[in-house]
Each structure stands twice: as C-alpha cells, then as structure tokens.
C-alpha cells in the first residue's frame, strides 16, 4: 500500500503542473457564481467556464480507475462472506469434561403417541348429497 502512494503522486504531477501554468483568473472572475445567490444561478450556469471540460472527464476516469484498483487490492484482506464460506463452520463436538451418560435427553412435554386420536369425519360423496349423478 505504501508503494502505491509514490505512483499516485507521480501520476498527479502533470495535473498539478498544468494547473499552475494556466493563466490565473482574478478573484472577481472567480466569484461570478455565488452559492448564496440562487436567483442568479441560471445566468451564471449558462456562462462558459474557463476550465476545460476534458479535464473533468480525465479526473473522472482517474477516479474510477484508482477506486477500482484500490478495491481489487484490498479485496483479499476481507475474510468473511463468500471469501471464506467455512469461517463459522466449527466442528460440533461435545466437551471432553462432560461424560456422555450425564447428558440429559430432552423431555417430551406432550407425548402425542399416547394420546387418543380423534376419529376422522365420514366421507360423504357429492353424489349422495344431491341424490344422483347430476
């Protein structure tokens, strides 16, 4: 990760050099669009910017590529989810200090086999109810 920092700085040097050599605008020109005056936003919005539009595209592409590279770099460090499906699959073995004969069996609260089963209702045919084979 520390080796990536010099590479990123070297890649950003042309941007800094070109920005510093560009003609500087006066503060009055930079304050054409004021955020505290929303009623003049549309007038300011239609003015041509001094900043070239291709720089915005270049900065966007660099941002997307650097975020992608960063995410691919740190992806193997995450040790959960689909990266390690057996992370929580510990073997379920009884403790050695508890003898097996002392483990109590779960108590059956209701013994369904011993209870009398209700009788099923008699099967009545539809034809018997209507009186024929309508």
UniProtKB/Swiss-Prot annotation:
Leader sequence segment: 1-19
The record, for InterPro entries, names:
Adeno_E3_14_5 (IPR008131)
Membrane spanning residue stretches: 54-78
Q: Does the keyword Methyltransferase apply?
A: no
Could you name the domain of life of the organism this protein comes from?
Viruses
Q: Name one GO cellular component term.
A: membrane
Q: Which GO terms describe its biological process?
A: regulation of signal transduction
| Membrane topology listed for this record | Single-pass membrane protein
Q: Keyword Kinase: yes or no?
A: no
Q: Where in the cell is it found?
A: Host membrane
Which parts of the chain are coiled coil?
none
The UniProt keyword set, sorted, is:
Early protein, Glycoprotein, Host membrane, Membrane, Phosphoprotein, Signal, Transmembrane, Transmembrane helix
Please outline how this chain is modified post-translation. Answer: Phosphorylated on serine; O-glycosylated, but not N-glycosylated.
Q: What does this protein do?
A: Down-regulates the EGF receptor and prevents cytolysis by TNF.
Task: Give the family, as the similarity comment puts it.
Answer: Belongs to the adenoviridae E3_14 family.
Q: What is this protein called?
A: Early E3B 14.9 kDa protein
């Amino acid at each position: 990760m520390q080796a990536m920092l010099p590479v990123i700085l070297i890649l950003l040097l042309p941007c800094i050099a070109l920005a510093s050599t560009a003609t500087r605008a006066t503060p009055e020109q930079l304050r054409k669009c004021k955020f505290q005056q929303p009623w003049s936003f549309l007038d300011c919005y239609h003015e041509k910017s001094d900043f070239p539009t291709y720089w915005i595209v270049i900065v966007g592409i660099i941002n997307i590529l650097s975020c992608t590279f960063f995410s691919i770099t740190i992806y193997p460090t995450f040790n959960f989810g689909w990266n390690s499906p057996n992370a929580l699959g510990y073997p379920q073995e009884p403790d050695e200090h508890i003898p097996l004969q002392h483990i109590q069996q779960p108590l059956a609260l209701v013994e369904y086999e011993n209870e009398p089963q209700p009788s099923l209702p008699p099967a009545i045919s539809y034809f018997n109810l209507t009186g024929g084979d309508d």
